[in-house]
């Protein structure tokens, strides 16, 4: 089995930038054009949301995007077919960037865990982030994901104690994901001086206890914040700001144009 794209990327001596996108948002047919636009605009990893009706870790922007995606017909099966088409270059240029899926346990259980891992690999997925899967209870899932060559990412928060940072670091396949602040996605106010200082101290603490790379997300909105986070972390994730920028799009073409326009401001 060949090494997956995420593993290949994290071996490089570079800081990386991850885009979070909710499929078929804001209009049906947007996904493949947006993936092409992001890749051509220099994205390093594409994180695709698996829409869920009760996304406990997501703020209003991503919740609204998830509800839109569900209304537009996005299921896990539909999403995996979009990934397959992206990898094959059907409906867009062939997408080669690593693809990470982010979603919650219940839909995966309903789909069938083993079937999901098999189908995700076959479609061209590289990794998985399941926010409500506790690392302490993930041994079976981790073993199976490893068997399929899929990267698994676990979350660290500002209140995670040092010994648990070390556990999460050891269990995350290639990198862990640090929540910049406690709360939900898109609600962080990283421009606040006190918040920024607290985040810096927290990321320094993670660096002391992590042997692998880690990325940081929640509330990152612009190039200045991306570059600031790169001082402490190996990667930055931008999601809610991207979704807000494209939210008023009326066509897939406009969505892709705006996605590219926004992403280029981060580089």
UniProtKB/Swiss-Prot annotation:
Signal peptide: none annotated. One of its GO terms (cellular component) is cytosol. It catalyses: (1S,2R)-1-C-(indol-3-yl)glycerol 3-phosphate + L-serine = D-glyceraldehyde 3-phosphate + L-tryptophan + H2O. Coiled coil: none annotated. The active site is at residues 47, 58. Pathway: Amino-acid biosynthesis; L-tryptophan biosynthesis; L-tryptophan from chorismate: step 5/5. It is an enzyme of class 4 (lyase). PROSITE patterns: TRP_SYNTHASE_ALPHA (PS00167). Its EC number is 4.2.1.20. Keywords: Amino-acid biosynthesis, Aromatic amino acid biosynthesis, Lyase, Tryptophan biosynthesis. One of its GO terms (molecular function) is tryptophan synthase activity. The alpha subunit is responsible for the aldol cleavage of indoleglycerol phosphate to indole and glyceraldehyde 3-phosphate. NCBIfam families: trpA (TIGR00262). PANTHER family: TRYPTOPHAN SYNTHASE ALPHA CHAIN, CHLOROPLASTIC, TRYPTOPHAN SYNTHASE, ALPHA CHAIN. Belongs to the TrpA family. Tetramer of two alpha and two beta chains. This is Tryptophan synthase alpha chain.
């Amino acid at each position: 089995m060949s090494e997956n794209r995420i593993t290949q990327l994290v071996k490089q001596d570079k800081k990386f930038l991850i885009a979070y996108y909710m499929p078929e948002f804001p209009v049906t047919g947007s996904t493949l054009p947006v993936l092409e636009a992001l890749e051509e605009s220099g994205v390093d990893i594409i994180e695709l949301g698996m829409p869920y009706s009760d996304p406990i870790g997501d703020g209003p922007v991503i919740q609204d995007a998830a509800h839109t995606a569900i209304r537009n017909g996005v299921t896990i099966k539909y999403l995996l077919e979009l990934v397959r088409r992206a990898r094959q270059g059907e409906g867009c240029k062939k997408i080669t960037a690593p693809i990470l899926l982010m979603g919650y346990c219940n839909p995966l259980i309903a789909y069938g865990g083993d079937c999901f891992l098999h189908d995700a690999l076959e479609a061209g997925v590289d990794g998985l982030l399941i926010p409500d899967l506790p690392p302490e209870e993930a041994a079976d899932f981790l073993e199976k994901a490893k068997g399929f060559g899929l990267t698994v990412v676990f979350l660290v928060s500002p209140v995670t104690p040092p010994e648990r940072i070390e556990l999460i670091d050891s269990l995350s396949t290639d990198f862990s994901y640090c929540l910049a602040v406690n709360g939900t996605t898109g609600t962080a106010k990283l421009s606040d001086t006190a918040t920024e200082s607290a985040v810096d101290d927290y990321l320094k603490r993670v660096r002391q206890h992590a042997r692998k790379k880690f990325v940081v997300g929640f509330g990152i909105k612009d190039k200045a914040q991306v570059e600031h986070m790169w001082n402490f972390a190996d990667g930055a994730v931008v999601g809610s700001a991207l979704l807000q920028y494209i939210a008023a799009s009326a066509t897939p073409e406009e969505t892709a144009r705006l996605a590219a326009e926004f992403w280029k401001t981060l580089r």
